[in-house]
Structures are given as C-alpha cells and as structure tokens.
Amino acid sequence: MKKLSIALLTILLSSIILFSGFKSVNEIQSNTIQSPPNEFEVLLNYLETNRNFINSPAAPALLPASEVKQNLKNEKYHIIDIRSASWFEYGHVKNATNVQPADLLVHFENSIIPSEYDKIVLICYSGQSAAYFSGLLRIAGYDNVYSMNWGMSSWRVDFAENSWLKNTSSDLAAKVETTDHAKAAKGSLPSIETGQAEGEAILRARLEKAFATPYKESIVKSADVFANPDTYYIIDYNGADRYAKGHIPQAVQYDPNSSLSSGADLYTLPTDKQVVINGPTGQETAYVVAYLNVLGYKTGNIAYGSNSFMHKTLKDNDWGAFTKKNVNMYPVIE
C-alpha cells in the first residue's frame, strides 16, 4: 500500500509539473501573439533598407525648366501637371497630363507604365507641392520621378507673378539669429496604427493617407514661426556654414541628406509638437516633409523657405534666391 501511495503521488506530481509546463508555453505563445509589432520601427527599417532616398545624394530630385523644354518631344519624358483644372486650362506645358495629387498613385499604377520613362516630371505652381508629391512617389519606389524647379513660375512670367514674385520678402531678415542651438535629446517615437505587420504593407497604408491629404495642410508661414517659435521644433535644413550666418530664432541645424536616419539624428525629433523645416526655397524641404509625414511625425514646411523672410541675403550670397532671372518665356498650351 505504501509503495502504491508513493507511485500515485509521483504520478500526481508529474502531472502537475507537466500541466504547469504546458500552461507556461501557452502563456508565452499567448503573450507573443497579443504583442503587436511596433509599426514605426518596422516601417523605418523597411524604408532605410529599400527606399532611403531622403538620406542620399539623390535628394532633392529637382529638374530645371530648360531640360523639360528641351525634351517636350521626347517620348521618354512624361510630364504631369498637378495644378487645378482651371490653371491647367489657363496654360500648361505641351504634352502635360493634368492629374490631381490624390489620384497620382492610381495614375502610376493604372494609366502608365512608369518604368518605360527615363524621367517623370511633376509640375505645380511654385515647385513646392510638386516636390512634396514627388517625394511620396520616390518613397513609393518610383526612382525616375522629379519635380520641376520653381514650378510654372520658371516657365512664364505671369505664373511667377502669381506665385514666387509675390512671396519673396526680407521683412524678417533683421530678426534672424546666429545662436547655435543643440538638438533635442532622443525621445519617444511616433505612433503608427495601420493594423499591418509588414513594412511594405504599412508603407502602402501610410502613402494612401498621405496622397489623400492636401499639401496645404503641411504649409507653415515663416511669420507664424517667428512670432511663436516655442510652438514648434524648428529645423534649419542647411549646412553649418549657412546656419552660422543667420537662421530663424531657436532653429536647430540638421545636415541635408544624412541627418534624418536612425543612425544619425532622426530620434531627436519630438512627437509632442510640430516639426517645421526651413531651407532656401521650400522645395528641398518638401521632400523631407513627405518622408517624415509618412513616418508619422507631425511635420510642416515653411512656405518659400528663407526666400520668404531673408530674400536679399540669399540673393547677395547666391544661396538660392528666386529672381526674375529664373523666369523664362516658354510657350504654353491654352
């Protein structure tokens, strides 16, 4: 009887241990299943591995109007005008196709075969919104997409008068500072919730949202930033030399083409306030804003860049000032 009791006790203990082991495994599996992937980290890894355009010498992808003019008969160039239908009707580049920004992905996937072209050129009013959506298309994997420098403002003077020529100013030039501000400490990451687990699928969802959002929602006026610098995290997207010679108060300098990667300074961008980016023209920074918006940062582009508040300084130093010398008198289709 004693031996039987010992045997039964042994079997009972073995069963308890075995059951506990299964329970632990089940709990681990349950916890593993219930823990969703960090979508920001998955997306960032995917972009830096496959679509790292913004941190490469290829950015920004600006094309001069002269090259577009020279290739109007070139079937390897596809020109897309993203302005409103009324402005397109008023005057557009020969052979251009009018496509609204929200329809660009559909146009690329269903209306054309992008790989058949050497260059696909987006055109807008000033070059800024075209740069933004070209940036999104680059992120989507279309490496032959460019934006026309200065937009239609460089094509004919009446377009320039409605855009660039009335938006350059030196009114705030006396308020720039030369103080060197340190980057913020690394903090929290953006929260992305697409419900997807793979980088490509997350990117697709983010791109669809970005194309559906009007570019105007990313525009910030320089006057507002000067008036309320504490409201924003201000990035001066110029080289250190230009930064040292004058920038928006409280702006922090970030190196173009290299600083916004996980191995550099990307994680210093805050998630509790809007990040606004300033460059010479607003075009180069529009590409950056597109990238950061896709990653989940709340990002704004200072309209017309430094041309909007220290135009004379840019002109005197040959730092990318827009002038009438940038305006051509090329023909349009009306």
Q: Which residues are covered by each model-predicted region?
A:
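Cysteine-dependent PTP/DSP-like catalytic domain, specifically the C-terminal lobe
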Residues: 147-176, 303-322
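Eukaryotic modular interaction domains in large regulatory/scaffold proteins
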Residues: 237-238, 242-245, 249-255, 260-261
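Surface-exposed intrinsically disordered loops and tails
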Residues: 57, 252-254, 309-330
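Catalytic cysteine-centered active loop of the rhodanese-like fold, especially the PTP/DSP P-loop
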Residues: 108-155, 254, 262-312
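Post-signal peptide N-terminal segment of secreted/secretory-pathway proteins
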Residues: 58-77, 82-112, 117, 121, ...
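Flexible, polar/low-complexity N-terminal or interdomain linker segments that lie immediately upstream
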Residues: 13, 22-78, 85-90, 160-242, ...
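Bacterial N-terminal signal peptides
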Residues: 9-17
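Positively charged n-region of N-terminal signal peptides that target proteins for export
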Residues: 1-4
